[in-house]
């Protein structure tokens, strides 16, 4: 297949912007890859370059009609595409694509001494081609200008400056095609002459620094082909052309010309951009860094391919990922699929460019894709973490686990959720959806640890609340019982009872003397801290109980009770019966001293060994143990031990004395009352004077019956202690009677009031009538 040629660079030195479209038309939908070759021809004007190309590659370049006029035919640089190479083996198209550059001839009359385009065209051809065909006639060999050796020298110098330090094995094949070789001079002799000239030219080059020892063969390979005379040896000419064509298509032949190191390793669309940039820099007389141009082309094309692949990936990612976020298996599978498709598409089209650039852009593309995948993986793992933390929390509260210590429950459940999280993150990592999992593992561990602290704090608070509740009940019950029955060793009992309550309440947590483990996974210091907090609470509670209970009135009551028990009862708890006031006074003094023995004990918490009761749980509190003043401006050194100050104590004593004095006076009055009894003869007088009344009662059956009923009722009421209910019934009856009487009286008063009011109204009406009558009579008299 051969396409119509286009002008790649016109006479005005402008690069054809439609060239890329031309390449697309030539290639179609085929994936050419690197399976294409660029071949250019270089030589003097009217030397038959276009004719040779048309015969060899079946192209359709314009040719000169020598019978009309010898003149310039090819203007600028033309490009043609072909797959049909003239050869001995086959007349069908080859598998490779050939792009042929027909360069304007040198030394033409049309340009005269303007050799600028010749040099630029030659430099362009050698920069973009794999094979540069140098077309010359046999009779030109040995000439300097005629066989373009001067132009080749210029091209060699520029080429050396461009590629002198490139450090790779890229070369350009200089294929010298000797035209009209009639065979008089052997081809080998002509070849040696040309090689000698070329080596001489190379030796005379101005080599840049670092390239002094380079040779012609470091940059170029040389091949020589002779063609018979086209007119005089027509059959030989065409046979030689086919032999030349064989060397372009038979890759198995030793004479195969298109070696891999001649190729620029750019896909066809990349080659077009590369060629355009090369010409732009050549035309603008810039230093032409061809390797850099190849890299720039590779960068542009690979970036374009990467952007296209990423755009497709993004579209699929944004439309479908959210639907699969709750299903790990489906999510991982889908993310893996779209990532592989994205990278596969990039690899397919970008791997043809420079390997370093391709790999660099691939890394950038992978980073962009992984960034999106990282977002999705993070979201899924955050959701999974929330689910697992909820599972951990619920598992900690399950009945079958609640009996286990906190740390045992936590470790058991943590292993399960950790395994589930590790399985999920490993699946993402194994599918290359996550590049790093350490940060996720650390975040998960931190989240779980934070949840553990929350759960532990919650359970610890619940446990402490339960302990404090038990302490509150026990301290209030047992300590108030002791305070209500004070003894000289009261505070020894209070502190001992306090310690016993603490030990009993915390017995299940005790691990040694003064050592406790609350089974919450706390450190030794943390357990000590919790124990001291509980002990501080207990001491605070005890202080509150003591100070709230031992108020002034309560202490007075305790002193009075202690006085009463000693004053009214003997050592056997038998009530005392006093015969005279001396006995009362003696008992009063003893009972008073007995009661006041505990006054100091109740107002100041001091043990029997003389030491004040000082809580041992407030060592770190700045206010405990310091001098402070109370509401009465009395200073104390310890707020727990000092229950009442001296002023309050004196007030208690005064109230106590007043109350016991009243008690003594009542006792003395009872002695006086019992000593002033009724004389016996009075009873004899009552019997004599009331004998008749007694007899009336005894002889009357009704009175006897009522008397018996009254006596029996009194007996049973007294025996069973029913005076309370009886009095309630009596009081209720009296109350009802009283209410009824009041209601009746109220009605009576109201009725009487209404009657009086009615009578008054009637009287007023009568008076009004009388006044009217009298006035009317007066009027009649006046008339």
Swiss-Prot record:
It is an enzyme of class 3 (hydrolase). GO terms for biological process: endoplasmic reticulum inheritance; endoplasmic reticulum membrane fusion. One of its GO terms (cellular component) is endoplasmic reticulum membrane. GTP binds at residues 43-50. The chain crosses the membrane at residues 678-698, 702-722. Its EC number is 3.6.5.-. The keyword Iron-sulfur does not apply. One of its GO terms (molecular function) is GTP binding. Pfam families: RHD3_GTPase (PF05879), Sey1_3HB (PF20428). Residues 699-701 are lumenal. It is a multi-pass membrane protein. Residues 1-677, 723-783 are cytoplasmic. Keywords: Coiled coil, Endoplasmic reticulum, GTP-binding, Hydrolase, Membrane, Nucleotide-binding, Transmembrane, Transmembrane helix. Residues 33-265 form the GB1/RHD3-type G domain. Residues 449-472 form a coiled coil. Cooperates with the reticulon proteins and tubule-shaping DP1 family proteins to generate and maintain the structure of the tubular endoplasmic reticulum network. Has GTPase activity, which is required for its function in ER organization. Belongs to the TRAFAC class dynamin-like GTPase superfamily. GB1/RHD3 GTPase family. RHD3 subfamily. This is Protein SEY1.
